[in-house]
């Protein structure tokens, strides 16, 4: 499965770790869309501090987006990927809106003779949907998390990286450097550009398992974490056949940029392309991190093998 690093924590104790390929104990590894879930934890910390309200409109914080698809959307819509837009998350796109997005974020080079005005200018141009309304669809769209990152920088009056370090990494006891990719103008790609060490991501997962607490202090409000785990109506989620999530977790849901699996142990997880996983099983008191370098963005066969592996590990430790 092209695994670079793998670790298991059970009841707060590291019981297994393994490295190969690009993995090393002291080397940050890109976590791709797990970055989204990390951003949601930071958003929760800011909600707890009273600087962010998830029911406020996106444009209350970012009036720059008033002409975009984000007009009329709330922060909660961002968090649950229930924004109606004309964006398509298509990794095969070589010259359309998804490629324009990647170029704006400085993840792909600008074509010869071309130019980009950066990620945030791209977000101001996000096309509206002609067929749906906010809150009526689950539409996995990476740029929505970049908007959340912009909101976080606006309300915190500091960079996303500094705030994540101050409010999440340090309180969890992280011991290695982390970083996040930036566009040409310094905007972070909060949708997928974070790189963290294996053990530090494991500690964040353990904080989530412990309802937001780490090292004797509240890092993220317990109410925020409980809401991520809470079972709720999932008809919007089940009505979609785009993205991979609904196919893996038919009875699951998506809350605050985390996947609810709908499995018997009420596991939640964060997933990144090319094989990144953060798996939390509250019933088995289990946290698992897998970092990898899959050849393809999404590999359903390997994903299902990993789900079976996570279940087997939980059964073996219970």
Regions found by a protein language model. Give the residues of each.
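Short, small/polar residue-rich loop motifs at catalytic or cofactor-binding pockets
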Residues: 1-3, 27, 273-274
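Structured C-terminal helix/loop/strand segments within mature extracytoplasmic catalytic/sensor domains
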Residues: 267-318
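Active-site SXXK
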Residues: 12, 30-54, 78, 148-152, ...
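Active-site Gly/Thr loop motif
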Residues: 175-179, 226-287
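A short, well-structured edge-of-sheet supersecondary motif
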Residues: 1-23, 285-289
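Catalytic-site signature segments of enzymes, centered on catalytic residues
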Residues: 25-26, 90-93, 101-185, 189-192
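Active-site helix/loop module of the DD-peptidase/beta-lactamase fold
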Residues: 30, 48-90, 155-192, 196
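Active-site-proximal alpha-helical segments within enzyme catalytic domains
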Residues: 81, 144-151, 192-213, 276-292
């Amino acid at each position: 499965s092209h695994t670079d690093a793998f670790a298991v924590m059970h009841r707060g104790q590291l019981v297994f770790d393994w490295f190969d390929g690009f993995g090393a104990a002291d080397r940050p590894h890109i976590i791709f869309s797990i970055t989204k879930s990390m951003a949601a934890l930071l958003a929760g910390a800011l909600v707890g501090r009273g600087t962010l309200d998830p029911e406020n409109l996106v444009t209350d914080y970012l009036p720059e987006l008033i002409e975009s698809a984000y007009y009329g959307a709330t922060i909660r819509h961002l968090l649950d990927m229930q924004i109606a837009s004309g964006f398509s998350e298509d990794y095969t796109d070589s010259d359309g809106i998804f490629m324009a997005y990647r170029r704006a974020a400085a993840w792909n080079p600008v074509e010869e003779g071309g130019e980009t005005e950066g990620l945030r200018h791209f977000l101001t141009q996000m096309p509206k949907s002609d067929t749906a309304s906010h809150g009526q669809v689950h539409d996995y769209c990476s740029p929505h998390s970049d908007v959340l990152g912009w909101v976080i920088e606006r309300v915190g009056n500091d960079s996303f990286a500094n705030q994540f370090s101050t409010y999440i990494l340090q309180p969890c006891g992280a011991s290695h450097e982390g970083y996040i990719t930036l566009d040409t103008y310094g905007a972070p790609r909060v949708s997928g550009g974070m790189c963290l060490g294996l053990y530090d991501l494991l500690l964040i997962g353990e904080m989530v398992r412990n309802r937001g607490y780490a090292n004797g202090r509240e890092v993220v409000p317990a109410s925020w974490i409980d809401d991520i785990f809470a079972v709720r109506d999932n008809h919007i989620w089940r009505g979609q056949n785009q993205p991979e999530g609904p196919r893996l977790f038919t009875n699951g849901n998506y809350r605050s940029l985390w996947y609810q699996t709908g499995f018997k142990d009420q596991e939640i997880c964060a997933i990144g392309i090319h094989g990144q996983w953060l798996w939390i099983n509250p019933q088995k008191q289990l946290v698992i991190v897998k970092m990898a370098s899959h050849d393809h963005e999404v590999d359903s066969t390997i994903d299902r093998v990993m789900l079976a592996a996570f279940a087997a590990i939980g059964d073996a430790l219970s």
